[in-house]
Amino acid sequence: MGCGMSTEEKEGKQRNEEIENQLKRDKLMQRNEIKMLLLGAGESGKSTILKQMKLIHEGGYSRDERESFKEIIFSNTVQSMRVILEAMESLELPLDDQRAEYHVQTIFMQPAQIEGDSLPPEVGNAISVLWKDAGVQQCFQRSREYQLNDSAKYYFDSIDRIAAPDYIPNDQDVLRSRVKTTGITETTFIIGDLTYRMFDVGGQRSERKKWIHCFENVTTILFLVAISEYDQLLFEDETVNRMQEALTLFDSICNSRWFVKTSIILFLNKIDRFKEKLPVSPMKNYFPDYEGGPDYAAACDYILNRFVSLNQHETKQIYTHFTCATDTMQIRFVMAAVNDIIIQENLRLCGLI
C-alpha cells in the first residue's frame, strides 16, 4: 500500500492553504483599510466633513452632481425664511414695512420641498425683500430662541445668484446644504495607500440606539461638536442645552467599553459662528463656572477642557482640532494631520510599532 496522500487529503490541504492565503490577504487589506465612525449630535457638521472629503480627495462635484443639489438648496432657503416668519409671529415682532406682507404670503404658500430647475422669480424676490426688512433682521438676531439652519444667512445673502435662471451651485452652496441624516451611510475614499470607509450615523436622539454595537472594530472615531451651539436648545427637546447634550454623548462614547482601544479625534466645529456669538451671547449665562468673558481663546480653552476632562482612561489620548467644516483649506490641513494620526494608530493596532 502506497504512502501518498489520498485525493481527499490533497483537497483538504489545498482548502487549508486557500483559507490561510485568504486570511493573509484579509490582514493585509485590513492594514490598509481605515474604518472611521463619524459621531456627534445633530447638526454638528458630520455630513459637511464627508462633502469636504469628496472635494479634497475626489476632485469635487461634477456639473450633474451640483445640479442635483439645487432643489435641496432652494428648499433650505425657503424653509429658513418660513422659520423666521413663524418665529416673528410667536415672538410678536412686526415687519418694519407692512407692504412686505404680500411677500410673507408668497413664502407661506410654498411647499416644504421646492421642485424644479430654478427658484420661481416671485419667491426669490420675496426672500430678497424680506431679508432687507428691519423686523426680519431683528428676529434673525434672536435665532438662538428658535430652530434656524446655520446656512440661512449665507443663502439669504446669495439670493440674487441662487434665484438666477442659470444658477449652478458652487462648492460653498453644496457644503452648506442640509439634509437630515437618518440611518447609517457609508462613504469610501482612497487616500494614498489607505482606503477610508467612513460611516455617518444620524445625530438626532432617535437615531443613537442604532450606533454602538455595530462599530466595535472601527479604527478611529471622529467626534464633532458644534461649539457655536452653547446657547441653543435641542431640536428634539427644547429643555436641553445643545452643548450639554454633546458633553453627555461624548462622555458615553469616550468611556464606552466598545471603544476602549479606539482612538478618538475631536473636532470642535463651527468656530466662525462661535467667534461671532461670544460678544453678544455671554457664555457665562449657560455655563456659570466660565470666567473668561467674551475672550475667544479663553472660551475655546474652557470648552476643550470640558470635553477632554471626561476621558476616564489614562492611556487613551484624545486628539483635538478647532474647525470650520465649511472652510475647505482648513479642513484639507486638518485632515492631513488626522491622516498622520490614523496611520500611526493603524500601525500600532497591527503590531508594527
Curated annotation (Swiss-Prot):
GO terms for cellular component: cytoplasm; heterotrimeric G-protein complex. Residues 32-353 form the G-alpha domain. GO terms for biological process: G protein-coupled receptor signaling pathway; pheromone-dependent signal transduction involved in conjugation with cellular fusion. Its cofactor is Mg(2+). A lipid is attached at residue 3 (S-palmitoyl cysteine). Residues 35-48 are annotated as: G1 motif. InterPro entries: Fungi_Gprotein_alpha, Gprotein_alpha_su, GproteinA_insert, P-loop_NTPase. Residues 173-181 are annotated as: G2 motif. Gene3D superfamilies: GI Alpha 1, domain 2-like, P-loop containing nucleotide triphosphate hydrolases. GO terms for molecular function: G protein-coupled receptor binding; G-protein beta/gamma-subunit complex binding; GTP binding; GTPase activity; metal ion binding. Residues 196-205 are annotated as: G3 motif. Keywords: GTP-binding, Hydrolase, Lipoprotein, Magnesium, Metal-binding, Myristate, Nucleotide-binding, Palmitate, Transducer. Belongs to the G-alpha family. G(q) subfamily. This is Guanine nucleotide-binding protein subunit alpha. The lineage of its organism: Eukaryota, Fungi, Dikarya, Ascomycota, Pezizomycotina. The gene is CGA1.
